[in-house]
Amino acid sequence: MVSNYNEKHIKVLKGLEPVRKRPGMYIGSTDTRGLHHLVWELFDNAVDEALNGSANKIEVVHKKDGSIIVTDNGRGIPVGKNLATNLSTVDTVYTVLHAGGKFDDQAYKVSGGLHGVGASVVNALSRKLIVTVHRDGGMYESIYQDGGKIIQPLKKVGNSTKHGTIVQFWPDPTIFKNIQFNPYMIKERLHESSFLFKGLKIVFVDENNPELSQTFIAKDGILEYLKYVNENKKSISKIIPFKGDYEKIVVDGCFQYTDNESELIISFANSVKTSEGGSHENGFKQAMLETINDYSKKYKLINNKDKGFDWSDLKEGLSVVLSVQVPEKIIAYEGQTKNKLFTQEVKVAVAKILTQQLFYFLEENQADAKQLIERFKLIKEAKEAAKKAKENTKKLKSAKSERVLYGKLTPAQQKNPLQNEIFLVEGDSAGGTAKSGRDKRFQAILPLRGKVVNVEKSRLQDLLKNEEILSIISCLGCGIGNNFNIKNLKYHKIIIMTDADTDGAHIQVLLLTFFYRYMKELIEQGKVYIALAPLYKISAKNSNKSAFAWDDYQLDELRTKYGSYEVQRYKGLGEMNSEQLWTTTMDPSKRQLIQVSIQNAAQAERKVSILMGDDASIRKNWINENVDFSIEE
């Protein structure tokens, strides 16, 4: 600690230095998620041109050299001099924080750009960035390097009959842990965005793998999106759309019920996904609940004296897509990265539009309305019965849970959830080795002896009869479903450790499906990991040297290094002794973990429904084709 705190300790960061000093404040993180956030920022800027009716085509290219190019056929960034900075407007937008057209509602009525810092933040975190503008009969270009330093100020490089903006950037390897873009992630995001704009042509080109290249045009907008999300589920209601505007806020939404037990709400504000929800989702829930209760009482489908339904009665099997367009002057988010919408006027707008249109739908489709309300009543009754049964058998269940855990869980010695981690280990054999090899201070071991149930094909009451699932719920301590509370979680890391084979991959998929359906926040908060065990041990014949390889590439390197050698292929965790398991898979300073995340809710929903549905052959084929049981570089 510095004792003589004085004037010299006050730093004034100039230009784009604040972004490079604290990138997490602007893009959330410097991992894979943060890296791709740069693409989303430039893409969102292009989408803003479409939002305002100035562009009908956007192209994103993943180049062989690792760079990304985003092109739109919008108006093109103005090329004249900016009076406030004495730089060209293009150079101002890309080198000055909080500069851009989004602050003037005459230029953009609505936008999704990151509070006027998106373009400059991408530049700040790139080793090189080139902007090309087609506007007013000319072609103009600016070049920046090493975090936004102007190498070539904007200059005219030719004539042009086109209009629009082209941005190419190379991420800075001194900022990001990994600068390899995931083309599948980019493609999924572009596909998702295409549903928000009827007729907008979005093109993805991958020069490294041309087969991934695809053009997206959605003719039916978000109705098409909801059909896409629910394609592999059994629907039990029509798709119910609602659309309108109130106080210059435009609302476009639709919802449907399926036979799935979980709730899915996918929401957007000015075309940007709001993964943490916010005021628009709150307005939807409020209006949905009030309208269903009012209609039910009006037509005596429930007793007027009854307090009615609550949200937990309505959310089972509900899929929603909700998009709002909010005037730039009133839009507000919680934080820079726009994951949660804050604007309270949006809640009012969504509620008013949905209330009016949903009530009209229910009155015009009374058979459908009655079917839905009967469903809500059954869910409510089942929930109340389950609550009574839970109270009556609380002691018995507690005793049973303790018996299930007894002899299974090997707890950590310390009790600090922020430091403790739990390994969910496939089989008794590996579980025993893990117990011997672990660090007893902070590592707990839970062997999974029996079969983990497929939660996608089981209802909650059946799920709770499975001893493996009960063990996991009891160990984690945070509850499931409506009773989930992450504050009660006993471990900051939940690590799935299975054999590197098809059976091991199947167990991983089953466990991840369980977490996704009933403890999704664990994944959203980055608490779930997959341990990567080595595939090979290579030993030199002429010495005591040995090493481990996680894939064939590493094995080939070691073969070249060792000359004369023996190779052991690990078929299961149990083939390693406790010291080897600790060194390769459990030691925090050496192990390799994959953090499980949900980048795209719609894709996750579709894949879970497909993989864990009734057709086991689909699941088996997917595992065989997509899981290579080695670390992703």
Curated annotation (Swiss-Prot):
<dbReference type="InterPro" id="IPR001241">
    <property type="entry name" value="Topo_IIA"/>
</dbReference>
<dbReference type="Pfam" id="PF00986">
    <property type="entry name" value="DNA_gyraseB_C"/>
</dbReference>
<feature type="domain" description="Toprim">
    <location>
        <begin position="420"/>
        <end position="534"/>
    </location>
</feature>
<keyword id="KW-0799">Topoisomerase</keyword>
<dbReference type="InterPro" id="IPR013759">
    <property type="entry name" value="Topo_IIA_B_C"/>
</dbReference>
<dbReference type="Pfam" id="PF00204">
    <property type="entry name" value="DNA_gyraseB"/>
</dbReference>
<feature type="binding site">
    <location>
        <position position="499"/>
    </location>
    <ligand>
        <name>Mg(2+) 1</name>
    </ligand>
</feature>
<dbReference type="GO" id="GO:0006265">
    <property type="term" value="P:DNA topological change"/>
</dbReference>
<comment type="similarity">
    <text>Belongs to the type II topoisomerase family. ParE type 2 subfamily.</text>
</comment>
<dbReference type="InterPro" id="IPR005740">
    <property type="entry name" value="ParE_type2"/>
</dbReference>
<comment type="subunit">
    <text>Heterotetramer composed of ParC and ParE.</text>
</comment>
<dbReference type="InterPro" id="IPR014721">
    <property type="entry name" value="Ribsml_uS5_D2-typ_fold_subgr"/>
</dbReference>
<dbReference type="InterPro" id="IPR002288">
    <property type="entry name" value="DNA_gyrase_B_C"/>
</dbReference>
<dbReference type="InterPro" id="IPR013506">
    <property type="entry name" value="Topo_IIA_bsu_dom2"/>
</dbReference>
<protein>
    <recommendedName>
        <fullName>DNA topoisomerase 4 subunit B</fullName>
        <ecNumber>5.6.2.2</ecNumber>
    </recommendedName>
</protein>
<dbReference type="InterPro" id="IPR020568">
    <property type="entry name" value="Ribosomal_Su5_D2-typ_SF"/>
</dbReference>
<dbReference type="GO" id="GO:0046872">
    <property type="term" value="F:metal ion binding"/>
</dbReference>
<dbReference type="Pfam" id="PF02518">
    <property type="entry name" value="HATPase_c"/>
</dbReference>
<dbReference type="InterPro" id="IPR000565">
    <property type="entry name" value="Topo_IIA_B"/>
</dbReference>
<feature type="site" description="Interaction with DNA">
    <location>
        <position position="506"/>
    </location>
</feature>
<keyword id="KW-0238">DNA-binding</keyword>
<dbReference type="InterPro" id="IPR006171">
    <property type="entry name" value="TOPRIM_dom"/>
</dbReference>
<feature type="binding site">
    <location>
        <position position="499"/>
    </location>
    <ligand>
        <name>Mg(2+) 2</name>
    </ligand>
</feature>
<feature type="site" description="Interaction with DNA">
    <location>
        <position position="619"/>
    </location>
</feature>
<feature type="binding site">
    <location>
        <position position="501"/>
    </location>
    <ligand>
        <name>Mg(2+) 2</name>
    </ligand>
</feature>
<dbReference type="InterPro" id="IPR018522">
    <property type="entry name" value="TopoIIA_CS"/>
</dbReference>
<dbReference type="GO" id="GO:0005524">
    <property type="term" value="F:ATP binding"/>
</dbReference>
<dbReference type="InterPro" id="IPR013760">
    <property type="entry name" value="Topo_IIA-like_dom_sf"/>
</dbReference>
<feature type="binding site">
    <location>
        <position position="5"/>
    </location>
    <ligand>
        <name>ATP</name>
    </ligand>
</feature>
<comment type="function">
    <text>Topoisomerase IV is essential for chromosome segregation. It relaxes supercoiled DNA. Performs the decatenation events required during the replication of a circular DNA molecule.</text>
</comment>
<dbReference type="Pfam" id="PF01751">
    <property type="entry name" value="Toprim"/>
</dbReference>
<feature type="site" description="Interaction with DNA">
    <location>
        <position position="451"/>
    </location>
</feature>
<keyword id="KW-0067">ATP-binding</keyword>
<feature type="binding site">
    <location>
        <position position="426"/>
    </location>
    <ligand>
        <name>Mg(2+) 1</name>
    </ligand>
</feature>
<feature type="binding site">
    <location>
        <position position="45"/>
    </location>
    <ligand>
        <name>ATP</name>
    </ligand>
</feature>
<feature type="site" description="Interaction with DNA">
    <location>
        <position position="454"/>
    </location>
</feature>
<dbReference type="GO" id="GO:0034335">
    <property type="term" value="F:DNA negative supercoiling activity"/>
</dbReference>
<keyword id="KW-0547">Nucleotide-binding</keyword>
<feature type="binding site">
    <location>
        <position position="72"/>
    </location>
    <ligand>
        <name>ATP</name>
    </ligand>
</feature>
<feature type="binding site">
    <location>
        <begin position="113"/>
        <end position="119"/>
    </location>
    <ligand>
        <name>ATP</name>
    </ligand>
</feature>
<keyword id="KW-0479">Metal-binding</keyword>
<keyword id="KW-0460">Magnesium</keyword>
